[in-house]
Amino acid sequence: MKSWSSRPVPELPGTGTAPRVHDTSTGQLEPLAARDGRASLYVCGITPYDATHMGHAATYVAFDLLHRLWRDAGWSVDYVQNVTDVDDPLLERADATGVDWRELAESQTELFRTDMSALNVLAPQHYVGATEVVDRIVPAVERLLERGLAYRAPAGTGQGGEPAPAGDVYFDVDAAGALRAEDPDAWVVGSTCRLAGERDRMMPLFADHGGDPDRTGKRDPMDPLLWRAHRAGEPSWDGASLGPGRPGWHIECSVIALDLLPRPFTVQGGGSDLAFPHHDMGAGHAYALSGQPMAEHYVHTAMVGLDGEKMSKSRGNLVLVSTLRAQGMDPAVIRLAILANHYRTDWFWTDELLEQARRRLGTWREAAAKQETAGADAMLEAVRAALGEDLNSPAALIAVDAWAARNLGGAAARGSGASSQDTRLARDTVEALLGVVL
């Protein structure tokens, strides 16, 4: 699957330092280390039926900051993002709108690409649809069956009481967790998000985020689906010994990551709603297949709301990037509105936030339009320091604000040492590290 085009990133003087980020698996700020000068990133992509809402945009802009920081530190970056281009919500939306699910997925994926390019998000090297890797998922599920870490469920009833045919394949979380007796680093359910042993907390999350605890015939209600046997009216693929069907959600990302990234890769990223079960179960699948942890660190972005409520597809209160762009909004303003909020803090989208970002961008561009400015060296170091400490974008914006104010305050405020080179450095800093073109 094609990705999108990226603007060249300006090179900055000096070298940035390795950032520290909050790791969900430890609950602490952790330094990120390169391996032979390379860092690797997997960010879970969209299910393409309501792209690109502000929650999506906030997540991908946050990990774009990390991508840019790694490059500024002189590291090469291996970046993979998937597209869940077949899944129950997509099929339900296609059925409700009378659009073929493949057409819906492709149109929404193309819209997402356009939005990401407009927001100046650096493209992943690998952009992979789940439907493109079914032929690799099937043997992975077969291996889990052979190792006794998965099982076929008998015919029964599904999550909504609908008939469930024999042949659904589930991951056995208890059998996989037992591997810890041999390896203290082995996965157990909940271990990547500090929920291990807290079943009362995990079960509601499992049910609310794609799980099917009420499916009869499962060994444990929290066992996740690996292969969904074919149902009438649903797309299916040749599953070899599994029979016709389609893959479960978590195994898609596990297989893509194992195929394209080191083991373990540096950062697994996504929204906080993916921490459990999606990222945790995906880590379980990856360990069961490879005998190694999936990722070194798990990093999650907070939720975005509107008018005091969580922004979500189910609530129908989405603010779409494409809608704002169609209304004539500069994508750089949208990006600045996102960056005004720390990636780990829940926040609400408002018209005032957008207006503040519009005014801020205008001020920055006015300063950057001056032939000669001063203070860009200090601004560069302040932006690097702010982003290096858990991607503190609000602090980074304040550093640019200070530079702009100094250079719009007249010669006395600007002081000595003004030059055209300073203006170029300021523009390059804001674009290279914050992704905002002045």
Curated annotation (Swiss-Prot):
L-cysteinyl-5'-AMP binds at C44, G45, I46, T47, T59, N82, V83, T84, W249, G271, S272, D273, V304. A motif ('HIGH' region) lies at residues 46-56. Its cofactor is Zn(2+). Binds 1 zinc ion per subunit. It comes from the Bacteria. InterPro entries: Cys-tRNA/MSH_ligase, Mycothiol_ligase_MshC, Rossmann-like_a/b/a_fold, tRNA-synt_1_cat_dom. It catalyses: 1D-myo-inositol 2-amino-2-deoxy-alpha-D-glucopyranoside + L-cysteine + ATP = 1D-myo-inositol 2-(L-cysteinylamino)-2-deoxy-alpha-D-glucopyranoside + AMP + diphosphate + H(+). Its EC number is 6.3.1.13. Zn(2+) binds at C44, C253, H278. A motif ('ERGGDP' region) lies at residues 208-213. One of its GO terms (biological process) is mycothiol biosynthetic process. Residues 1-27 are annotated as: Disordered. Keywords: ATP-binding, Ligase, Metal-binding, Nucleotide-binding, Zinc. Belongs to the class-I aminoacyl-tRNA synthetase family. MshC subfamily. Monomer. Catalyzes the ATP-dependent condensation of GlcN-Ins and L-cysteine to form L-Cys-GlcN-Ins. NCBIfam families: mycothiol_MshC. This is L-cysteine:1D-myo-inositol 2-amino-2-deoxy-alpha-D-glucopyranoside ligase. The gene is mshC.
